[in-house]
Structures are given as structure tokens and as C-alpha cells.
Amino acid sequence: MPGDYYDILGVDRNASKEDLKRAYRRLARKYHPDVNKEPGAEERFKEINRAYEVLSEPDTRSRYDQFGEAGVSGAGGFNYGDMGDMGGFADIFETIFSGFGGGMGTGGTRRRTGPVKGDDLRLDLKLDFREAVFGGEKEIRIPHLETCQVCKGDGAKPGTGAKTCSTCNGQGQVRRATRTPFGSFAQVSACPACNGQGQVIEEKCEVCNGAGRRQVTEKVKITIPAGVDDGTRLRVSRKGDAGLRGGPQGDLYVYLYVEPDKVFTRDKMNILSEITISYLQAILGCTVTVDTVDGEQELTIPAGTQPNTILTLENLGVPKLGNDAIRGDHLITVKVDIPTRINAEERELLEKLAHIKGQSHGKGGLEGFLGSLFHK
């Protein structure tokens, strides 16, 4: 005896038609044999189908509510062959399993004759650091499917056409009946002769071999906006695969990967780098030339600059993505080089400086004295 159909779908007896549809979609996706290979999944799937078949139609639902299974047993089990007259039910199946590709196997497959959008494509593109900062144009080569210009996409040799598939009589699907102790069930799959189209080409196009599309490699210029970062995704409209039966072309998605730079790193819109100056430059101050993404720039080192001080070059960072009039800053970390060896003349001068400062340098040497000049 089958279980209670409301319990099978997990709904109460006052469930609306939309509640039933949502429950069915969820359970059918979960237990479909093409998706769920666990033991018992196929039987569970059949129960779900039967429950929805009965409860989705007001007449059969009313009889079931009054008399239980006995009131609907004359239906003889779920019949996939009737799906052509059950538009709503078949539409649910098509919605649920449209993403599985190649049809449902043992479930119901509707013949699709309308336009189908082409597949989207992905391309990974490497940029150097400056290209990511300033953007620009890149020319890439992308292999994709385009509509065959000889047959205009229908796959037939010019001057010929298509005929009704004799295997499925134009239905696009073949059915096989299976008898079980619980009743008869019809299993449906896409027709292998016409791939579910219901028609077969009399003479295939010699250029695309009947596919209606052919593989080509196209040169595409893409614009890289200023300020992109590692992992940024760009969409290039209508540069994916051509659609089927007049469907629109897919899109190309370009994923950007920024290669590390030897000098610069990035923190959002700011560019980071380091310079090393001598202890005398740190004490006395100076002007040095530093590398930036805009070329060499002069940087003023204030007198008494401490190690690891961060100095800022404003508006020399990364442009804001989508508004390159706004830029971040270039932040420069100053490293101070304290020598480990000095010559005699330097030693004499430093000893005089140590005497003036009233600092002893016997313990730890002059290196210790130099280190004491900076606050660490």
C-alpha cells in the first residue's frame, strides 16, 4: 500500500497548488535517479511523482481526499506519455532538470525545439602590476562555437531539409514500460536517433557535419579598466558560444590575475614600497629619488626620520575602479641602514659626536651608539 500522498510530499492537507509545486520540485530534484544513486532513491522518486500526479489535479485530489487510494487507483499509475497534455506538470520537470544537460535519462524529457542560448565561456588572463593599475586594451584569442554560415545553423546541407524521426515519430522521446508489484511505470529518455529533437537531417551540412555550429578561434580586443585587482571578473557580451536554433550568443567572462611585482605591493587603492637610506640621511634629512608606477619621483626625507617611518606620495596610488579621477596614495616605508663597519676617519668623527652627546661607546661599540640615535 502506498503511503499518504500528503506525507510523501511533506505538506498538510490544506496545501495550495503552489505549495505542492514547491514541495514537488524540491523532492524530485533530490531523489531523481540521475542525481541520487542511493538505494531506494528511484522508488522514492516514483512515489513522489505519483503523489504529485494525484494531488496536482483538483478532480483526482478531491477523490483522494474522499476515498484515499481507492478513489484514484483507476488512473493506473504515473504515465509519462501523457505529459504533452499536462503542460504545468511537464514544465516543472523541464525547469527542475534543465541544468543537467543531456536530458533526464529515466525521467521525463520534453523535446525542445525553441531557441537555446549559447554557453558562456571563461578565460583566465594574467596582467602585470602596472596593467592592473592603469588598465588598457588587450587582444586575446578565444576559441568558441559560431553559427555555421553555410547552413545558417540548421545543420542541413543547402537545398535539403529535415524529416520526422521514424524512431520516436517526432516526439523526441522514447518510452519503455516497466511492471512492478506496485503498478506499471513508463520510463522516458531522449530519442537516441534524433537526440530529442523529433527530426533528423536528411543530408548533413558538409562544413559543420550537421551540428549547425563550428569551432573557430576569434581575436577579441577587450578593455581593461584602470584599478582592477586580482580576481576581478570582466563580462564581454556575446563573445561566448553561438546559440542553437536562433538562440542568442553566450557571453565571455574574463577572470584577471595580477602577477606580483618586484618593487610594489598593493593594499586596496594604496601602493606600498620600501626604500633604504643611510643613518646620516636619516639624521640630517635629504631628498631622494624613488620609483613609482608613474615613474621616478622626488621624496623628501625629514631630518630625524626614524626607521620604519611611512612617508606618503599623495595621488600616486591605484585609481578607483569605475572612476579613475580618484586615486589612492603611494606609501613608502623608510629603512635606515646602520653600518657594521666604518673607516678610521668616520670613527674619529663619530667619537667626537659621541663625546658631544655625552654618551659612552665603549660597551657595544659605535654601532650601539648609532643605534641609540634612533628610537626603535
From Swiss-Prot:
Cofactor binding, note field: Binds 2 Zn(2+) ions per monomer.
SMART domains the UniProt entry points to: DnaJ
Protein's UniProt keywords contain Metal-binding: yes
J domain: residues covered: 4-68
Cofactor(s) needed by this chain: Zn(2+)
Chain positions of all zinc fingers (CR-type): 135-217
Subcellular location: Cytoplasm
Family: Belongs to the DnaJ family.
Cross-referenced PANTHER family: CHAPERONE PROTEIN DNAJ A6, CHLOROPLASTIC, DNAJ HOMOLOG 1, MITOCHONDRIAL-RELATED
Protein name, UniProt field: Chaperone protein DnaJ
Name of the gene encoding the protein in the UniProt record: dnaJ
